[in-house]
């Protein structure tokens, strides 16, 4: 991790989907930079473990419940983060879900759930956070949305996920234009294949081509969650002050050729 332990002193950060994988890595990165972090997810036991893992870091990590599929829960999580720290500087929209299914097998409920978690939750968290981010101390907060390489290309057996992640990219651009004349910054990370707990439990549907699913691993293999978290933290930092409306692909060069 970065040796700059004061990069986010006095800054408050809300990270969604923070109980494992990329979200947990982002919490640790921000805490290492001195941030006040509100880690939000459904699994409170895992969140407690993430917070405990940050105990020796200079930041302050609190945690609470969030179900991004529920707009009211999104509003409550933002209010809780502001209540804990008095203000909000950064929102990291990381929560998501991904199941592989052949398109003819996707039910209406599965489609609705994927869109609710992967796209609507991003919108409702941003909607609740923006009024606070516009009043962030020091002049403007920022949002980092986590999409996927499936937000810029197609991904097999992932119709709902791909549609939602393309939506996150579009939402990022829409918000960036809407707040072009304000101090608020909005950017998006599109990670490729990461070595997270989820990747070790991939359920390949019957009739699927496993090689198509594993294309995201690229020639250099899976990235660590911490590598991608470093990109999130950079975009949220003052060092990225000129970056607004950007779609940052982080994929070991997979989409380069």
Predicted regions located by residue number:
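Alpha-helical segment proximal to the catalytic Tyr-Lys
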Residues: 131, 177-181, 241
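Active-site helix of classical SDR
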Residues: 126, 164, 172
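Short C-terminal tail/terminal secondary-structure segment
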Residues: 2-5, 153, 233, 244-257
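Substrate-binding pocket helix/loop in short-chain dehydrogenase/reductase
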Residues: 102-103, 107-115, 213
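Conserved glycine-rich cofactor-binding loop
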Residues: 19-20
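Short, small/polar-rich loop/turn modules that mediate ligand/substrate recognition or access, typified
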Residues: 92, 180, 185, 243-245
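Residue(s) in the substrate-gating loop at a strand-loop-helix junction
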Residues: 148
């Amino acid at each position: 991790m970065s040796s700059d332990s004061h990069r986010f002193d006095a800054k408050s950060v809300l990270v969604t989907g923070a109980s494992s994988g990329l979200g947990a890595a982002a919490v640790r990165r921000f805490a290492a930079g001195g941030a006040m972090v509100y880690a939000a997810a459904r699994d409170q036991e895992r969140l407690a473990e993430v917070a405990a893992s940050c105990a020796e870091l200079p930041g302050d990590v609190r945690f609470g419940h969030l179900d991004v599929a529920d707009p009211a829960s999104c509003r409550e999580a933002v209010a809780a983060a502001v209540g804990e720290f008095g203000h909000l500087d950064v929102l990291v929209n990381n929560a998501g879900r991904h199941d592989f299914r052949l398109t003819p097998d996707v039910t209406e409920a599965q489609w609705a759930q994927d869109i609710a978690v992967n796209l609507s939750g991003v919108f409702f968290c941003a909607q609740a956070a923006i009024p606070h981010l516009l009043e962030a101390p020091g002049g403007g907060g920022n949002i980092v949305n986590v999409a996927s390489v499936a937000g810029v290309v197609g991904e097999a057996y992932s119709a709902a996920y791909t549609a939602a992640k393309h939506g996150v990219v579009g939402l990022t651009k829409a918000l960036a234009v809407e707040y072009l004349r304000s101090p608020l910054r909005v950017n998006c990370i599109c990670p490729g294949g990461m070595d997270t707990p989820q990747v070790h439990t991939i359920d390949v549907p019957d009739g699927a081509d496993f090689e198509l699913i594993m294309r995201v691993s690229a020639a250099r293999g899976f990235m660590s969650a911490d590598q991608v978290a470093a990109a999130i933290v950079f975009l949220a930092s003052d060092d990225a002050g000129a970056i607004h409306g950007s779609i940052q692909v982080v994929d070991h060069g997979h989409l380069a050729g």
